[in-house]
Regions:
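Outer-membrane beta-barrel porins/channels
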Residues: 21-43, 47-53, 69, 77, ...
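Positively charged n-region of N-terminal signal peptides that target proteins for export
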Residues: 1-4, 142
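N-terminal periplasmic accessory domains that precede
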Residues: 54-66
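Sec-dependent N-terminal signal peptides
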Residues: 4-14
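Sec/Tat signal peptide C-region and signal peptidase I cleavage site
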Residues: 16-20
Length: 202
């Protein structure tokens, strides 16, 4: 009975979404986008289950395991107003260290008119965000898995750029009969290293 109570309690607690940002005050919203069609279709930030989709796994590194050895994932999405998103991920397993994955996520906001104060168009410029991900996942025992992501983030708008570092920490539990799994995750913990405001806008 205690096992069932514990499992139900974990499910209820893990289903509550907590956010560290208030709408409008967050930066690097590219970190909230879904590189995987699977997570986007389910409306989730990450999948708490084990999958063969490396682009979904990279958002929850504790589900990265040896079964994903040499997996490659590529996604491309066309959004509204000329915005497009692409991602590439690859995983490799090392016996003693665990499973590693490399990922790149690209969000292109399209082309914009460059204007003078009076509104005259003098050219065009582009804006884009890039997220580079190094993932690590390891099985502690047959049911418990842990993982972490290191994510450098680069924003490049016209000739201005900004840089940040973020990490994700996660732990997952999978039932012995493999019928259900839960994950606990802290995402996008980090700091902006270089801001747009630190540059000369004249």
């Amino acid at each position: 009975m205690k096992k069932y109570f514990l499992a139900i309690s974990i499910l209820i607690i893990s289903s509550l979404a907590t956010k560290a940002q208030i709408g409008g005050n967050a930066i690097y919203s590219v970190l909230s986008l879904h590189p995987s069609a699977k997570t986007a279709a389910l409306g989730l930030d990450f999948l708490p289950c084990f999958s063969d989709d490396i682009t979904a796994i990279i958002n929850n590194p504790s589900t990265l395991r040896k079964e994903n050895h040499n997996d490659i994932g590529i996604t491309y999405t066309t959004l509204f107003s000329g915005i497009n998103q692409a991602s590439l991920a690859y995983s490799h397993t090392l016996d003693k260290i665990g499973s590693l994955a490399l990922g790149v996520q690209y969000l292109n906001y399209g082309s914009f008119d460059m204007t003078e104060e009076n509104g005259d168009v003098v050219g065009k410029f582009n804006a884009a965000d890039y997220v580079f991900t190094l993932s690590w996942g390891k099985m502690l025992d047959s049911n418990v898995y842990i993982g972490a992501n290191l994510k450098p983030v680069v924003s490049q708008y016209e000739s201005y750029n900004a840089f940040a570092l973020a990490i994700d920490l996660s732990a997952s539990y999978q039932s012995t009969d493999r019928t259900w799994a839960v994950s606990l995750m802290a995402r996008n913990i980090g700091k902006q290293i270089k801001t747009f405001a630190s540059q000369d806008f004249t």
